[in-house]
Amino acid sequence: MENLTVEKTVYAPLLEQDSILLSVSEGCSYGKCAFCDFANDQYTVFPLEWVKENAKYLAAQSGDKSSVFLLGQNSLSLPTAHILKVLEYVKAYFPKVERVGMYARAEDINAKSEREMSMLRDFGLRTLHIGLESGSDDVLTLMNKGISASEFLEACHKLDSLALSYHLTTIGGLGGKELSAVHVEKTAEILNRTYPASIWQLKLFIWPNTPLADMRARGDFIELSPMEVLIEERELLARLHLNNCFFMDTTVLNQYTIMGHLPDAKSSMIAAMDRLIAGDSP
């Protein structure tokens, strides 16, 4: 039987690269973020029978892998009963799997009751990957993120109370030149009030045919240079006071990777950034 996964490009976190990738949905049900190219894609929810058949196919070649990642940019927005059925398939066809992860938007988490989230956890959901992108409400509004920083914290605190692990992403330079300072300050402030397993600092890429591309063309958004993004990130990292958190950026100056565990590697990562800012090799 052929693989039923039809996504042209697989979007999964780097930390899930060794997981079994099972398609549940494609695209984003929100699709309104100014910086995101998913706004141009059709949002699709794959039928449960389709997911079941794909799980059967993947089970034959999954080997001893112990984790599954449910593909789809915010599959947690699906009805809880639908997700529970998918988790049943995971249990049935991947008996060695110990952990299931997926993407989620903060409002998807807030929309589900604690009972619903507890049921998902009890059926195997262990990890959520969530885009904070910025802790500044000004930046979030500019980018039409559809959620406030306080609502984001509400989602993280719900996960904390349920002992569900989560990984966060932030985007360097998302505030442009005008909002750079507040972007760093507020993002660090929000991150310091959460307990993420990891933070992945992403590079801002301005996709064609997006609202952000239009903003740049009008002169309403002035993009930071790679060095300015690095200086911004260095300030963000210096402001973080987190424990047991893996920090990662694979796009430093478009050519370097900086990663390490907080708090132990904080000083060495900052030192590496300082060398790059000074024009030296890391």
What are these regions (language model features)?
Residues L212-A213, A217-P282:
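C-terminal accessory regions of radical SAM enzymes
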Residues C28, C36, V51, L70, ...:
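Conserved, mostly hydrophobic/aromatic
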Residues S150-P211, P226-D249:
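Conserved C-terminal portion of the radical SAM core fold
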Residues N74-L76, A106-D108, S134-S136, G172-G176, ...:
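Active-site-proximal loop/turn and secondary-structure-junction residues that shape catalytic pockets
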Residues A92, M117-R126, E185-W200, S268-P282:
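Structural recognition of alpha->loop->beta junctions
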Residues A60-S161, S165, H241:
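Conserved SAM/AdoMet-binding glycine-rich loop
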Residues S136-L142, P211, Y256-I258:
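A short acidic, helix-capping loop that chelates divalent metal ions and anchors anionic groups
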Residues E7-W50:
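Canonical Radical SAM [4Fe-4S] cluster-binding loop centered on the CxxxCxxC motif
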